[in-house]
C-alpha cells in the first residue's frame, strides 16, 4: 500500500509580518494538533517547529506590549 506523505501532514504557518500574538500562538497550535493526533487519534506523531527564534521573539514582543520585562520571570513559561 503506497500512501502520500502529504495526506498525513498537518501544517500551521505563521509569518513574520503578523502581529506578535499570532506568531506566538503558531507553535502552541502545532503542539496542540500533535497532541490531538497522538492522544485522540492514537497516531504516531513527528513535530517540527522551524525557527523557534520567531516564537521566542514574539513572546518578548508580547511581554513588551504588556509592559513587562521579557526576562522578569526567566525563560518564557511556554518554552
Curated annotation (Swiss-Prot):
Superkingdom of origin: Bacteria
Protein family (similarity comment): Belongs to the ATPase alpha/beta chains family.
Cellular component terms per the entry's GO annotation: plasma membrane; proton-transporting ATP synthase complex
Catalytic activity, EC: 7.1.2.2
Single annotated GO MF: ATP binding
Membrane-topology annotation of the record: Peripheral membrane protein
Keyword 4Fe-4S in record: no
Catalytic activity line of the entry: ATP + H2O + 4 H(+)(in) = ADP + phosphate + 5 H(+)(out)
Entry keyword set: ATP synthesis, ATP-binding, Cell membrane, CF(1), Hydrogen ion transport, Ion transport, Membrane, Nucleotide-binding, Translocase, Transport
Summary of the function given for this chain in its UniProt record: Produces ATP from ADP in the presence of a proton gradient across the membrane. The catalytic sites are hosted primarily by the beta subunits.
Subunit text: F-type ATPases have 2 components, CF(1) - the catalytic core - and CF(0) - the membrane proton channel. CF(1) has five subunits: alpha(3), beta(3), gamma(1), delta(1), epsilon(1). CF(0) has three main subunits: a(1), b(2) and c(9-12). The alpha and beta chains form an alternating ring which encloses part of the gamma chain. CF(1) is attached to CF(0) by a central stalk formed by the gamma and epsilon chains, while a peripheral stalk is formed by the delta and b chains.
UniProt protein name: ATP synthase subunit beta
Enzyme category, top tier: translocase
Keyword Transport: yes
InterPro entries xref list: ATPase_alpha/beta_chains, ATPase_F1/V1/A1_a/bsu_nucl-bd, P-loop_NTPase
Primary location: membrane
